[in-house]
A protein has these predicted regions:
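Hydrophobic pocket-lining residues within nucleotide cofactor-binding pockets
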Residues: 65, 225, 262-263, 321
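Beta1-alpha1 glycine-rich phosphate/pyrophosphate-binding loop at the start
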Residues: 109-113, 118, 127, 156, ...
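Positions that flank functional sites
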Residues: 37, 224-225, 265, 480
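Residue-level marker for well-ordered alpha-helical positions
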Residues: 16, 203, 241-244, 266, ...
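Residue-level detection of beta-strand scaffold positions
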Residues: 193, 209, 216-219, 254-255, ...
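Ferredoxin-type iron-sulfur electron-transfer modules and their immediate structural context
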Residues: 1-192, 275-301, 305-317, 321-507, ...
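A Rossmann-like FAD-binding core segment of flavoenzymes
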Residues: 237-305
Length: 516
């Protein structure tokens, strides 16, 4: 039979689901409750399309293609309908995509993943997670003001996890090793970048741009690299040799240093003319910047939003040159973020800055949820080193890291609710109710975790367990707005999912059912 999809005539066999016909044309149709080869459920309404003759919005997962159909797979009306469907699902979805500690970290480091790796004794892997976002882990582990610890949910139960000490340990272990870890680098781009300023912002910008394949040279008027880290931090708090070792690792990544060199207005213009990009990362008190013919405001150089680009030029700016900043982690984070913008500029892409994605958040835990989150943690208060200068021992690190509550989602990268909410710019608060569901975590099964507050009642897990004919399986319990998915008769997930556990975890469109 023949029908039209987006004004193109296509052929399809009788009885084929409309969604599959549209997908066969190469057009993606989002869906969260559709399970191929199983009876349709039509609960999420994210897969809607438009019937052109009638103008009706219809669910593509529950209709078979018919002769003569004329379908619009997506237009503004369809997008708005899908967005509304997602916002309704989000109104009852109680779960964080990223943990509060990660969100509050100016460098946006994946703190929960670092903690899990350290708790398992996977120190090398933990370092790799840290250095993905923090170029100077040993340094920052000693001097960071730790906004992440202020946001740590463990703090509301007893005391925050010692995140900075854990980060420091990962960095220190690398410095002690015979051969320090070096991140893989992209193929050389042939592009040359000057970074003016060897403080935390400049060091981070150069490090991450070098990893992206660009030839970087840091220019600084001082005899030593480090900027404010050398001048403003007590040597007892940050031993100079620790700072120098981490700077040397940045040099080992291919970054060149031209120290003891003053950059005046003429030199700056020469750099701009000669190179592919210039990063201004000078510290506080660099009054000469005002003569460099850059747009200025009362606090520093003017740059565009999160891209750190000066207008549409090849000049980018971060750190105190942008605005005064007291936190080393903040300017270091800016240097990392800036590297994405410079890389996009050098590759002649649209300059958008570091990619951001939708992030579900539900706020503070209520006391009734403390016990639920502690199920995946260990009891005991925060550990402190016997001698501050020496940090935590390996055994203490594993114990302290295990105090993490695992607030982030296990399916962070694959959650369809997150992916589609980002694609359709869904607003989590649009249909937000005054009261939210209480978070629960069921760990009875040895392979999966069930978090009912993240469930969108798509019915996929119910249909899969029906197929396996387990004694209990999963089913819908209750009626109306009170309905939940669970194991019948109050049985555990261990009894309900004897056969299909991993299959339902992999098929779940959110992080409600996930692998341990």
């Amino acid at each position: 039979m023949k029908l039209k999809i987006d004004n193109k005539e296509v052929e399809a066999p009788e009885g084929k689901v409309l969604m599959e016909v549209i997908r066969d044309t190469g057009t993606e149709v989002p869906s969260m409750c559709y399970l191929k080869d199983e009876e349709h459920f039509t609960s999420c309404m994210v897969c809607v399309v438009k019937d052109r003759p009638s103008g009706k919005i219809i669910p593509s997962c529950s209709l078979n293609a018919e002769e003569g159909m004329d379908i619009v797979s997506e237009d503004e009306e369809v997008r708005e309908a899908r967005k509304t469907a997602l916002e309704l699902l989000l109104s009852e979805h109680v779960g964080d995509c990223e943990a509060p500690c990660q969100i509050s970290c100016p460098a946006h480091m994946d703190i929960p993943l670092m903690n899990r790796l350290l708790a398992r004794g996977q120190f090398d892997e933990a370092l790799q997670v840290v250095k993905k976002d923090i170029a100077l882990p040993s340094v920052l582990g000693r001097i960071c003001s730790a906004p992440c610890e202020g946001a740590c949910r463990r703090r509301s139960i007893d005391e925050a996890v010692s995140i900075c000490l854990l980060k420091r340990f990962a960095g220190d272990e690398d410095l002690k090793s015979e051969k320090s870890w070096q991140a893989p680098q992209a193929s050389p781009s042939g592009k040359k970048v000057a970074i003016i300023g060897a403080g935390p912002a400049g060091l981070a910008a150069a490090y991450y741009l070098s990893l992206k394949g660009h030839q970087c040279r840091i220019i600084d008027r001082n005899q030593k690299a480090g900027g404010s880290l050398c001048k403003e931090v007590d040597a007892l708090e940050l031993p100079p040799e620790v700072l120098q070792k981490e700077i040397d690792l940045i040099g080992a990544a291919g970054v060149e240093f031209e120290l003891n060199k003053e950059v005046d207005a003429q030199t700056f213009q020469q750099l701009v003319r000669a190179l592919d990009a210039v990063v201004v990362a000078v510290g506080k008190g660099e009054s000469g910047v005002a003569s460099w013919d850059l747009p200025m405001h009362a606090r520093g150089i003017e740059a565009t939003g999160n891209t750190y680009q000066v207008g549409d030029s090849k000049v980018f700016v971060a750190g105190s040159a942008l605005r005064p900043a007291k936190m080393a982690i903040r300017v270091l984070g800016q240097g990392k973020e800036l590297s994405f913008s410079v890389d996009q500029f050098l590759r002649q892409e649209k300059v958008l800055g570091e990619p951001k994605i939708f992030n579900s958040r539900f706020g503070k835990l209520i006391p009734a949820e403390y016990a639920e989150y502690l199920k995946e943690s260990v009891e005991g208060k925060r550990l402190e080193p016997a001698v501050k200068e020496e940090g935590l021992t390996k055994e203490q690190v594993m114990e302290e890291a295990a105090r993490c509550l695992h607030c982030d989602c296990r399916d962070l990268e694959t959650c369809k609710l997150r992916i589609y909410s980002d694609a359709y710019a869904a607003d989590q608060k649009r249909f937000k109710s005054e009261e939210r569901l209480t978070c629960t975590k069921q760990y009875q099964h040895d392979q999966i975790v069930y978090e009912a507050s993240k469930c969108i009642k798509c019915g996929i897990c119910v249909r899969i367990t029906e197929k396996y004919k387990d004694e209990f399986g999963l089913t819908f319990i209750g009626r109306g707005f009170e309905v939940v998915v669970g194991v019948p008769f109050g049985e555990s997930t261990a009894k309900g999912l004897k056969t299909a556990a991993l299959e339902v975890a992999d098929a779940c469109p959110t992080g409600a059912l996930s692998r341990k």
